[in-house]
Amino acid sequence: MAEAATGFLEQLKSCIVWSWTYLWTVWFFIVLFLVYILRVPLKINDNLSTVSMFLNTLTPKFYVALTGTSSLISGLILIFEWWYFRKYGTSFIEQVSVSHLRPLLGGVDNNSSNNSNSSNGDSDSNRQSVSECKVWRNPLNLFRGAEYNRYTWVTGREPLTYYDMNLSAQDHQTFFTCDSDHLRPADAIMQKAWRERNPQARISAAHEALEINEIRSRVEVPLIASSTIWEIKLLPKCATAYILLAEEEATTIAEAEKLFKQALKAGDGCYRRSQQLQHHGSQYEAQHRRDTNVLVYIKRRLAMCARRLGRTREAVKMMRDLMKEFPLLSMFNIHENLLEALLELQAYADVQAVLAKYDDISLPKSATICYTAALLKARAVSDKFSPEAASRRGLSTAEMNAVEAIHRAVEFNPHVPKYLLEMKSLILPPEHILKRGDSEAIAYAFFHLAHWKRVEGALNLLHCTWEGTFRMIPYPLEKGHLFYPYPICTETADRELLPSFHEVSVYPKKELPFFILFTAGLCSFTAMLALLTHQFPELMGVFAKAMIDIFCSAEFRDWNCKSIFMCVEDELEIPPAPQSQHFQN
């Protein structure tokens, strides 16, 4: 009984919605009927006579002023439309029409099943959009003191934005602090230091934390034991203070490496001690988690220092050991550091082995994964690839695999080829990246451009094939080929992550809507006619009369008919009629 009542209500609702869709026609005829019935009481004929008399008394200057005013208003609307489009990437009038007017005109499907399916689809797409627009820590980020600050000293430009540095501060507070830091004075100072905006204040706080730790070791340790080894075990150095000094105060990679080695000694002792106490309560477990993050961060940065200083094999060994020791800590994306170091060693077999593990459908992708896979496929055929030969004989199986790998990589991040082909200038990569965005493309190309140049013909193959990707995905924001549709939010996030002097790459290219172009042309043409009519009324009257005579002439109609007939004949390819034998010579 309840199901029957529910079905009846749904049918009644659909009938009401259908009637509202066409009810405006009924209202229109009702209004016409009422006007006809009430024409005598309302004195419609007299009012029309008064209006016609008023219009007849108007001078041409009034029409010119009216036209100019309408053109001015249209121009203001055009300027607002252009500003709204530049800022938000869509037309304001189109957005209002789609969002507000279409539901009022009955453009919304009220079927319950369709609504449930669409709501589920929308929620899935929203979740995908959130995951796609998540900001990630750049696994190949540079050192602030030894690299970013040196760039600022030379060029006077700030390579990092406030938003990017604020995200780094949040990461440091997440990785390097815990709830029990207030129990240790040095850690309490560092907890405040990570929140400081001023770099000099952070560095001073790190030195203060080390000094407090040193004073406590001198005062308290002799009361407990006289052994130097026991002193180090009791009161270790503050590892996070050394991390901050290595990141921001050290002006060279060698200095940063020395500080990280001191941080490693302190961090390793804290890690071993908290590992034994982690099962004694939630507080000790959180402290052990913090010490694990600190130790992994230090070892990863030491491996990156070795890579910067040319000790690539040592860096590879350190990264492999780190991945074996902490296989579950994927937040640092150490495998991307390993791939870059292996490419520097030209150990392509090892690169393929790493890709086989991480280039999986269930794991999140990155530009490093996709473009490294494309580089390995291109390496097999790029030295012999020729566009002319490929157009004559077609692509071989290996060449087809390489082209498909390039198309896959370009679909994931379409900004990378412009940097690899040096069509756009590179800048220092940010500390955070947006996957599939311009920031990720800069971070990848900054370190991997040399690897592509080292493979003979790889850039030539990329240059010949990368634009073919866009033919497979004509509407990338709506539907993808191998990946989800391209996220809309990348441009806004990249503008926050990248410095203002860099021109952010936008995909897909935004074109001005036809409405804006049509409005601009119409406003300009109307304003020009109004100005000419006001300045030269007699000449414009003669011109208008001449144009009317031309369009109404018989010659113009005959010419128009002939043009239409010729177009139809060309379209249908009508063969010419055969000549009669009586007219042949």
From Swiss-Prot:
Phosphoserine PTM positions read S386
Membrane spanning residue stretches: 15-35, 62-82, 512-532
Decide whether keyword Magnesium is in the record: no
The primary site where this protein sits is: membrane
Query: Does Phosphoprotein show up as a keyword for this record?
Result: yes
The protein's recorded glycosylation sites are N47
Entry's localization field: Membrane
Membrane topology value: Multi-pass membrane protein
Key words, A-Z: Glycoprotein, Membrane, Phosphoprotein, Transmembrane, Transmembrane helix
| Sequence similarity | Belongs to the ST7 family.
Instruction: Indicate what this protein is called per its UniProt record.
Output: Suppressor of tumorigenicity 7 protein
Q: Which organism is it from?
A: Nomascus leucogenys (Northern white-cheeked gibbon)
